[in-house]
């Protein structure tokens, strides 16, 4: 910790400026008001593309960093308003169109639904039998499981949440207008990182987690304990009354009665006194460290989750008191950064992290790049935890939801990480001043970029040739009828020994790292099979040769994605081919006439290519997950305890050839979507075809050149002129960059929607 000099202590002056900047629709209603050229109105059809490209590119509106910061800040409130409206819609559907109460009464037999299709021209066929007499569309978002975990017991509570979320949306919209048009923060407020860290860590994460712990302890714990007892067929008694159904459960506010909640958790009887006297063991019945999962619901123990949030709250409240603001104590981020000088042997950057503080507080693109990389990685980590440590009741046996949440969080993470590279490249072009970064860490990385990229390229070639080589070998041997010469568990075995060792460490650690834990951290690490309602909720995930092979395909595709994105960032400002890239900007088609071979070299083009490889990588990941779980984990548990897996364990023998992936995964599991017509999953059949069409449509933009279209358009304009119906706005072909943008958007949209329909139609039928 560093003690600040006295002059740093007086920063308590107002950091908000009163502005009179009326929010007038006269201005907003004028298209392109933010750009002098666009405000003149359209002369050619290119105008509408430029309008969309620049509407949110605040850097292009003004070079005033304070004004840009205020626009971003205001836009965040608008974004939050949209999120609250979206949440309200989810709550409203749960309140008005769902079988939530029916699902709560029998979660192992009733399927969740929150949408009922009205008959217009026969689409009521989409309403499937959800059980308990309810007809609707099955949802796979996991909302019912989350709501049960919160302690929501009826639709009235959901309607209250729907109304509350709309009120919050209104407040957010109001805040967005107020903090731009009436009282706007000054630039120094946006750059006051210590204050921001203190408030976000202690307030948002610390007090937020503490508040959530309060809800979990006082509402979720008693409510879910009563529901679990009902589901287990052993209802509990409260005040002499048997709680035999969800309707009998007391309302949340009734649990503020200490005597009532103490009948479920005696620790509540100790009151707040035990906290101040240090007798924390009195609370050990509701702040637990059990480990494993609840055998009734197949989810983590609610008392473990409450304990976790309490620990998080304590950590973050402490963390939120570490940074120096108006008082002369605490850390200064600038001083911490400037104290890092780099290892003289491994990384000889004599200036270390000098200049980084200024770069990160004046380049919001740089800051956003870091944040997107972190958040994207976090989303991918969430995807893994949804099945390994299921947090919500009965979610583990809702296989469509499990596949849906895994796929969703993987793709969200992928898009955010590509976005991180995009904004890092924009930061390098618009915000990086080489004169301010001499021999610091950024400068050293840029000086070493040839070594970094060529090594990464070598790694990609090695991984690609070897991982694909294993598959080519196996396909050849199987084609020639020589199974004994294949890489497989039963022939030439290549076991993933490192991964198996890590599984073993996690399985064995439970007794030593957490002495009082009753079970390991997750059943996937050599654990036992947990059955809920006759279905597998969690089980050990055995790894073999097939996993070793596909994991190296993962390594290959991820490294290629990183190669493309990192090359885009490191060569954003200049390269041997185009030394003046920084002057050409983030996106440009080619380096002008007479410079052949310089097309598709901009930082934007690297993001464009990175998106395809991100999609490539994650398609293999979600296919691997989907097939592996159906083959080796998910299934029904027979009376004798044996498990009938959905695809009968065919992964180990089929996933070791390319032909096996095509035949036993893609083709075999497409049976449901291809044969869905005439059934309640027929919408997925239509989506499957429609999304294929959108995907194919993208190829038209990706495979053809701009000149072809310009030539075609000119002949069409000639025909219009002949008929005297020529438009006032001159039609022009899309630019190369615009065409590629339209192409990649439809490629990803078509690919993702195709995969969605393929997964859903299959798992809704067999899962």
Swiss-Prot record:
The chain crosses the membrane at residues 72-95, 158-181, 197-221, 305-323, 364-387, 403-429, 451-473, 548-566, 606-627, 681-703, 741-761. Phylloquinone binds at residue 709. GO terms for molecular function: 4 iron, 4 sulfur cluster binding; chlorophyll binding; electron transfer activity; magnesium ion binding; oxidoreductase activity. It holds the Pfam family PsaA_PsaB. It is a multi-pass membrane protein. It is found in: Cellular thylakoid membrane. It is an enzyme of class 1 (oxidoreductase). One of its GO terms (cellular component) is plasma membrane-derived thylakoid membrane. [4Fe-4S] cluster binds at residues 590, 599. Chlorophyll a' binds at residue 692. Keywords: 4Fe-4S, Chlorophyll, Chromophore, Electron transport, Iron, Iron-sulfur, Magnesium, Membrane, Metal-binding, Oxidoreductase, Photosynthesis, Photosystem I, Thylakoid, Transmembrane, Transmembrane helix, Transport. InterPro entries: PSI_PsaA, PSI_PsaA/B, PSI_PsaA/B_CS, PSI_PsaA/B_sf. PSI electron transfer chain: 5 chlorophyll a, 1 chlorophyll a', 2 phylloquinones and 3 4Fe-4S clusters. PSI core antenna: 90 chlorophyll a, 22 carotenoids, 3 phospholipids and 1 galactolipid. P700 is a chlorophyll a/chlorophyll a' dimer, A0 is one or more chlorophyll a, A1 is one or both phylloquinones and FX is a shared 4Fe-4S iron-sulfur center. Chlorophyll a binds at residues 700, 708. The PsaA/B heterodimer binds the P700 chlorophyll special pair and subsequent electron acceptors. PSI consists of a core antenna complex that captures photons, and an electron transfer chain that converts photonic excitation into a charge separation. The cyanobacterial PSI reaction center is composed of one copy each of PsaA,B,C,D,E,F,I,J,K,L,M and X, and forms trimeric complexes. PsaA and PsaB bind P700, the primary electron donor of photosystem I (PSI), as well as the electron acceptors A0, A1 and FX. PSI is a plastocyanin/cytochrome c6-ferredoxin oxidoreductase, converting photonic excitation into a charge separation, which transfers an electron from the donor P700 chlorophyll pair to the spectroscopically characterized acceptors A0, A1, FX, FA and FB in turn. Oxidized P700 is reduced on the lumenal side of the thylakoid membrane by plastocyanin or cytochrome c6. This is Photosystem I P700 chlorophyll a apoprotein A1. It comes from Synechococcus sp. (strain CC9311).
